[in-house]
Amino acid sequence: MTFDHDLKASVRTIPDYPKPGIMFRDITTLLADARAFRRAVDELVNPWAGNKIDKVAGMEARGFIIGGAVAHQLSAGFVPIRKKGKLPHTTVRIAYSLEYGIDEMEMHVDAIQPGERVILVDDLIATGGTAEGAVKLLRQIGANVVAACFIIDLPELGGAAKLRAMDVPVRTLMTFEGH
């Protein structure tokens, strides 16, 4: 489901950032607008209200902001998924593909127990490489990935379709054309 109209207007577009040809979708304006931020979180949470969700996993960095708010609304725990080397305790790690190479992400090995119901959250899905890696990481430790939620989808880049092909339901609030 997409909530495009007034919520979409709260996202700033910056052309040619971080490089020429890219239309950067800046959610800091949505986050700064209390009503828009509240509505976005409420719309991400609504499908799971009343369902048992054990944890919300957020991808670095804007996924921490949105995921923390979603976890609070669902009375669930929050689990940060970070770039390698950023967590102080024993971690589980996975390599994942980026547009121009490979990177690694990790989470604390004891953050999620096998069988726990988890929602993955981030601000935007583009090619889906990072989200795909996060789903694989969560499944590697036995999580039941119930869904992945994003404020913005760039459907031309195929990320949401990639997650659906992994049997992960995807919820987005708005779409933008292009990169």
UniProtKB/Swiss-Prot annotation:
The gene is apt. Catalyzes a salvage reaction resulting in the formation of AMP, that is energically less costly than de novo synthesis. It is found in: Cytoplasm. It catalyses: AMP + diphosphate = 5-phospho-alpha-D-ribose 1-diphosphate + adenine. This is Adenine phosphoribosyltransferase. PROSITE patterns: PUR_PYR_PR_TRANSFER. Homodimer. Its EC number is 2.4.2.7. SUPFAM superfamilies: PRTase-like. GO terms for cellular component: cytoplasm. Belongs to the purine/pyrimidine phosphoribosyltransferase family. GO terms for molecular function: adenine binding; adenine phosphoribosyltransferase activity; AMP binding. It holds the Pfam family Pribosyltran. InterPro entries: Ade_phspho_trans, PRibTrfase_dom, PRTase-like, UPRTase/APRTase. Keywords: Cytoplasm, Glycosyltransferase, Purine salvage, Transferase. GO terms for biological process: adenine salvage; AMP salvage; purine ribonucleoside salvage. Pathway: Purine metabolism; AMP biosynthesis via salvage pathway; AMP from adenine: step 1/1.
